[in-house]
Amino acid sequence: MRKIVAMAVICLTAASGLTSAYAAQLADDEAGLRIRLKNELRRADKPSAGAGRDIYAWVQGGLLDFNSGYYSNIIGVEGGAYYVYKLGARADMSTRWYLDGDKSFGFALGAVKIKPSENSLLKLGRFGTDYSYGSLPYRIPLMAGSSQRTLPTVSEGALGYWALTPNIDLWGMWRSRVFLWTDSTTGIRDEGVYNSQTGKYDKHRARSFLAASWHDDTSRYSLGASVQKDVSNQIQSILEKSIPLDPNYTLKGELLGFYAQLEGLSRNTSQPNETALVSGQLTWNAPWGSVFGSGGYLRHAMNGAVVDTDIGYPFSLSLDRNREGMQSWQLGVNYRLTPQFTLTFAPIVTRGYESSKRDVRIEGTGILGGMNYRVSEGPLQGMNFFLAADKGREKRDGSTLGDRLNYWDVKMSIQYDFMLK
């Protein structure tokens, strides 16, 4: 399998000299092949990570996705080959899930698509479930991942969709195996019970999802739930509303609610077995860019290998937002110098506790700066450059990590898409 994926990446590299399509996306109902090359560099000092505080990874990702459209308007196939190649890493530094330890890695995927009617769809096999990557049309509660690394979220099992009316969507998924952005050391792995002693999911338990979404031209309200024996029961809601202020200005509000309860073998007598999170964001959009404010509150922190609670709107490369009793608040501005070049400036404040004992208080402040440039014409049309730098500081009186923690983080990404139809 690794040889097959590696050969695909060689083909991707050869294609990088060809003309790129701007914002290339595969349409579900047409045949196509998308090639994505993504070069990423991460260098950081994250003292809250303990022995893994020094972070360095430089990688080249090659991602190939193909889609057949539908034969007789009923059945089709989709698939891909993803690979992350190591360009730079050091044995004495963490690669923070960009690599398999300090090694290259990859995998392939493929699924059969069945369209019983124009308003329904069934997928069987291994398929993408990452809305940021374009695998799903929007952020479906609990089902949709948003990978923070080179490769997107992938699920193995069955996915179903039914447009009940033009405004109401129903989604269901049964997932036996999964790849999340923290699974670089395992690749596609079984869903199941996490063993903190071995760092593996050694008891296989499939996970079932159900979600519904109502939408119109300015709103989307979605609700989803999942059940997984011996792991957790979860529920999530996502509410989005845009208000036109005049032809050139809009106000958008977003609100996320989340609740999780551990079940069976995942329950712990010394730690909280349930948690809740609420987070929201308000964005004012103007011709020159946008101004936004966001906030979030997490009741109890949980092991991210069991329940992912890092899903709120405030964002920082350095500071944790998913600690015990954590509040996080952020203000920011995106300023568009040209239609292609955008600058971002976003300070953040956090308040919470280091553990469920609540004996060490965390008071964090940080600032994020970033720039994004997209090539809009010429042979490199569609190439996207992203650079972000983050500086943070936490006060943790009495912590074994130190009373004052200083953070810095730099992330760079260059992405290039090429489409064949």
UniProtKB/Swiss-Prot annotation:
GO biological process terms, semicolon-separated: monoatomic ion transport
Gene3D superfamilies hit by this protein: Porin (2.40.160.10)
Record's GO cellular component terms: cell outer membrane; pore complex
Pfam families: OprD
UniProtKB keywords: Cell outer membrane, Ion transport, Membrane, Porin, Signal, Sugar transport, Transmembrane, Transmembrane beta strand, Transport
Protein localization: Cell outer membrane
Induction: In the presence of glucuronides.
Presence of the UniProt keyword Transcription in the record: no
Signal peptide: 1-23
Function: Enhances the activity of the UidB (GusB) glucuronide transporter, on its own however it has no transport activity. Glucuronide transport does not occur in strain K12 due to a variant at position 100 of the UidB (GusB, AC P0CE44, AC P0CE45) protein.
Annotated protein name in UniProt: Membrane-associated protein UidC
The species this protein was found in: Escherichia coli (strain K12)
